[in-house]
Amino acid sequence: MANLKEIRDRIVSVKNTRKITEAMRLVAAAKVRRAQDQVLKSRPFADKLARVLENIQSRVQFEAVDSPLLSKREVKSISLVCITADRGLCGGYNTNIIKKVEIRYAELVKQGYQPNLILVGKKAIGYFQNRKDRYAIKSTFKELEQVPTVKDSEGVTNEILAEFLSENSDRVEIIYTKFITLVSCAPVVQTLLPLDPQGIAEENDEIFRLTTKDSKLLVEKSNIEKSDSEKLPSDIVFEQSPDQLLDSLLPLYLQNQVLRALQESAASELACRMTAMNNASDNAKELASTLNLTYNKARQAAITQEILEVVGGSAV
């Protein structure tokens, strides 16, 4: 059995680790809230933009409009945009999205394509750069804001547009982690280009807030009710032609889709980190309890041994 000092040192170490994981859990919880706020703040613009596109769509057939972002040409090459985190300590978040990319990449190779990868996040960059012999990497992006902004999405969007408009890629897919609930998220594959605008569907979002109870910080959940979008008047007169309008609006729509994917991924990362740190805190608490029990047993055994030695010495 380990000596008392070793056990005592381990107990102190575990308790200190628990303080760190608990702090990281609370920080992640606060940042999840910020990430969700960012999504809600950007939604009015995205929703209005979708309404304008729907209005134009109701007047003309997109298929008849000469816009390069809507053109569906023969698919010869495909680009995959992969969004991961820059950091770890977030459970299986990075592993799950990388596995999804590998599966999709293998499917496309089996179909006869040679996909290019556009990587976002240090974890994806590090993983696939170590396997350059198996994966073709086109470009990389890292060190984005933890709560993504429009500026963060610009670089990724411009790279996607350059690939598609230069016909280096005939289709662009984005693979990111969709935020479902605080304890549930899932990697998804979405086609970005060619665009097929169908409007922005609002969901019954869950919002998480930090609260206090019995002098402890907790996280509570509430729901944001789905709002009814205001329809644009059907008699709006557009001065520009549909081609000119779409050439201006579709890149904005694409950038909004990229931003939404970045924001969902950020919220998922933070939620996974919060869950992972919560589990780590629980494990640390359980381990500390086990070590305390071991320490008490060792201490009791040492005291018993000393008593026996004293009694034995007296008998002599």
Curated annotation (Swiss-Prot):
Transmembrane segments: none annotated. Produces ATP from ADP in the presence of a proton gradient across the membrane. The gamma chain is believed to be important in regulating ATPase activity and the flow of protons through the CF(0) complex. It comes from Prochlorococcus marinus (strain AS9601). It is a peripheral membrane protein. GO terms for molecular function: ATP binding; proton-transporting ATP synthase activity, rotational mechanism. PANTHER family: ATP SYNTHASE GAMMA CHAIN, ATP SYNTHASE GAMMA CHAIN, CHLOROPLASTIC. InterPro entries: ATP_synth_F1_ATPase_gsu, ATP_synth_F1_gsu. It comes from the Bacteria. It is found in: Cellular thylakoid membrane. Belongs to the ATPase gamma chain family. This is ATP synthase gamma chain. The lineage of its organism: Bacteria, Bacillati, Cyanobacteriota, Cyanophyceae, Synechococcales. GO terms for cellular component: plasma membrane-derived thylakoid membrane; proton-transporting ATP synthase complex. F-type ATPases have 2 components, CF(1) - the catalytic core - and CF(0) - the membrane proton channel. CF(1) has five subunits: alpha(3), beta(3), gamma(1), delta(1), epsilon(1). CF(0) has three main subunits: a, b and c. Its main location: membrane. Keywords: ATP synthesis, CF(1), Hydrogen ion transport, Ion transport, Membrane, Thylakoid, Transport.
